[in-house]
Amino acid sequence: MCAINKAYLLTKFYISANSCAFFVKSQRKWTSPDLSEDVAQKFLETASEMKFDASKQVLVHGSYLINMANADEQKREQAFNCFVDDLKRCERLGVGLYNFHPGSTASCTKEEGINNLAECINRAHEETKSVIIVTENMAGQGNCLGGTFDDFAALKSKIKNLDRWRVCLDTCHTFAAGYDIRTEESYKKVIDEFDEKVGAKYVSGWHLNDSKAPLGSNRDLHENIGLGFLGLEPFRLIMNDSRWDGIPLVLETPAKSPEQWKKEVELLRFMVGKSSDDVELMKESARLSNLGAASRKEHLNKFEKKEAKKDRKKKSKDGDQTTLLLRKKQKLGNAEVKSLDE
């Protein structure tokens, strides 16, 4: 049986979910064998048997190699061809939503990277028929795009066909990028900001992951739900937010076996209709928090050491600049270098 059909069987029968995500080819190779007619047909038959609407309940994940923000035209074209191949595979399978990472600016400015990305998305819309391109938010690491809602606002302004463009919000990435969603008040503030800058109606999927790293760490470190720095409350809020009804909510948490995902699906369903002061939910939240305490302490320690190192480097650099300025003053006289202080 093909891997795609296995994903459906695992999802439907074992972990009792009603949506899923998978790759339509190897996510770490530029080229893969064509999608055979036999595989495509088996997928369609499996979806029909399981009463899955692949156009709405599946959120395919794109290749990790794709970087269409790249300033290098040759590399960008290679990424684009891989991207379009993914989209066409989705259309053959009847899949309606394709999620991908926006990429890194590499040797160009953020504005140039967003322009490159938008141009490729617009071209991809022209070369495909129906699949909706879903851009995922990122943790703000390095030169990656998608770490701020402003990035998405800028990208959206350059997309010609907004009917076929959407956003996937990842809870871990959102938190790591500095958006605090741990309380009802802060969650509302973050979603309101996204709604104002991009539009909540453009969210067509969530990746549900706790975070091993603390707020604003810019680290993409997924943790099992309830064990990390997010805790259960953000997931309760998402599960009870009617704006997300009918869109895929996909787990990307660490799991040695599907049993872990099955438990998390059950936990997420348990949260529906529950208030923050529900006794059973509070007990489960405390239990999971205790289980993850050692890991959180370890990652917080790593984060604090990294931040302290950055502060020392900054102070050293500032000190070097001050020393250089004083030397210039000694050579030229204070009056002649007055502008250096301004």
UniProtKB/Swiss-Prot annotation:
Output the lineage of the source organism.
Eukaryota, Fungi, Dikarya, Ascomycota, Taphrinomycotina
| Keyword set includes Metal-binding | yes
Do you know which PANTHER family this protein is assigned to? APURINIC-APYRIMIDINIC ENDONUCLEASE (PTHR21445:SF0), ENDONUCLEASE IV ENDODEOXYRIBONUCLEASE IV (PTHR21445)
Ranges of Basic and acidic residues compositional bias? 299-310
Per UniProt, Zn(2+) 1 binds at 61, 136
Region described as Disordered:
299-342
List the molecular function annotations (GO) for this entry: DNA binding; DNA-(apurinic or apyrimidinic site) endonuclease activity; phosphoric diester hydrolase activity; zinc ion binding
Entry binding sites for Zn(2+) 2: 136, 170, 207, 252
Name of the protein this chain belongs to: Apurinic-apyrimidinic endonuclease 1
Q: What is its EC number?
A: 3.1.21.-
* UniProt: Zn(2+) 3 binding residues: 173, 220, 222
Q: Which keywords, in A-to-Z order, does the entry hold? A: DNA damage, DNA repair, Hydrolase, Metal-binding, Nucleus, Zinc
